[in-house]
Structures are given as structure tokens and as C-alpha cells.
A protein has these predicted regions:
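Membrane-interface alpha helices of multi-pass inner-membrane proteins
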Residues: 125, 170-186, 191-192
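Transmembrane signal-anchor helices characteristic of membrane glycosylation enzymes that use polyprenol
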Residues: 12-43
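Perimembrane helix-loop-helix junctions
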Residues: 158-171, 191-212
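Short acidic/glycine- and proline-prone juxtamembrane loop motifs at membrane-interface regions
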Residues: 140-144
Length: 212
């Protein structure tokens, strides 16, 4: 982070903080949209699947065009919330679950992106994610797209950390997010495979460069 001689944030940092704040406001606003229980056909399918026993859920998901991880997340979180708030509508819970990955991306913007690239890059990263056209529809949609976006983006950010530091934590996180992406959406699975291939190629190139 850059500071001026007076100890205040630089103009670029201030702009980044403002953009990050606006992104956070949009994410919080998405939570207020969760109170509506109106859902469409695909979301009805999600809710119906999440109400099934795990074995039945997996069997039905095997016949669907999407992998089962998202449905398992919805089922697990919904049942956990119902332990504490039994009367809360499951649709409201499911919509809030869809906001969580965007909050996770804000967390990545605030910590690793900010530490590596400063507030301006972190703010742009967060703002561009949360201000995409029609994103308010996707942030609360009871489908897996937000989670797929989160897993792929997080995996990408850990690829960068692997190339910089090579710490085992980042290897573990990259593996975890890559697997989660593959089990969230098939397009995300393709993206994860591309990240694995890119990492292997970059590590090979890095090793070759060191060797001479």
C-alpha cells in the first residue's frame, strides 16, 4: 500500500478503497434481495434436489447435466440453518448461500490481491466482479454459477501464489478449489484443467530457465 508524506493513503489507494467499498455495498445489497421467495424452474429443481436424502440426491444428480457439489452445499447449509432457525424459508437460505461466494471473492480481493498489488488493483478486482451486468440476478440465483466462479477464481489466485512462493498451503488450496470447481459445473471443470495445465507448463518453463 502506498502512503503520502502526510501518512494518508495515496490517491490510487483511496480510489481502490472507494471501489472496494462500492463492491461491498453491492454484495450486502444482494443479501437484501434474498427475502423474496420467487424462483424459476431451474431453481425449483435445485430446491427439490436439496430436499432429497444424500443417496437419492447423488443418484438424481448423476442423471443431471451438472455435478452434485452445489446441491450438497445447499442441502448441508440449509439443514444446518434449520437447526437454529427451523421456520426460515429454505428458498431464502438457498439465495443467501448463492451470495456467499461473492463475499468470498471480496475476501480474496481484500487480502491476497491487496497485499500483492495494492488497494487500486484490489478495488478494481472487487468492483468489476460485483458490477457485472445483471449480476444482481446471479448473486441470489439458486444455482451453482457463483460457486463455480469462486472456485475457479480462487484456484487461479493460488496458482499465482504457487509460482511466487511455492508454499504447500497454496498447493493444497489450489488442489481443493480445482476439485471443487470440477464438481460444481462442467465449464468450471474445463477451466480447472486449463489451470492445472498452465501451472505445469509455467513450472516447467521456470525450472528450465533456472537450469540455463
Amino acid at each position: 500500500d502506498q502512503m503520502t508524506e502526510t501518512g494518508r493513503p495515496s490517491l490510487s489507494d483511496a480510489a481502490g478503497m472507494l471501489l472496494f467499498f462500492l463492491a461491498a455495498v453491492m454484495a450486502v445489497y444482494s443479501l437484501t434481495l434474498c427475502t423474496s421467495t420467487d424462483i424459476w424452474y431451474d431453481e425449483l429443481f435445485t430446491m427439490g434436489l436439496a430436499e432429497q436424502p444424500v443417496g437419492r440426491l447423488l443418484a438424481l444428480a448423476a442423471e443431471d447435466v451438472h455435478p452434485p457439489l452445489y446441491y450438497l452445499i445447499v442441502k448441508a447449509v440449509t439443514e444446518l440453518v434449520h437447526l437454529f432457525v427451523p421456520g426460515l424459508d429454505a428458498v431464502i437460505i438457498a439465495k443467501a448461500i448463492s451470495v456467499l461466494p461473492y463475499l468470498g471473492l471480496l475476501g480474496y480481493a481484500a487480502v491476497p490481491v491487496r497485499k500483492r498489488d495494492g488497494w487500486l488493483c484490489a478495488g478494481l478486482f472487487a468492483f468489476c466482479l460485483l458490477s457485472m451486468p445483471q449480476l444482481s440476478n446471479y448473486t441470489t440465483e439458486v444455482r451453482m454459477y457463483g460457486w463455480a466462479l469462486f472456485f475457479v477464481t480462487a484456484a487461479f489466485l493460488h496458482v499465482r501464489e504457487i509460482l511466487i512462493s511455492g508454499k504447500r498451503l497454496h498447493w493444497a488450496a489450489f488442489w481443493f478449489y480445482g476439485v471443487c470447481a470440477a464438481y460444481s459445473h462442467y465449464f468450471a471443470a474445463v477451466s480447472a484443467v486449463c489451470l492445472y495445465a498452465a501451472l505445469a507448463l509455467l513450472l516447467w518453463w521456470k525450472q528450465k530457465k533456472r537450469g540455463g
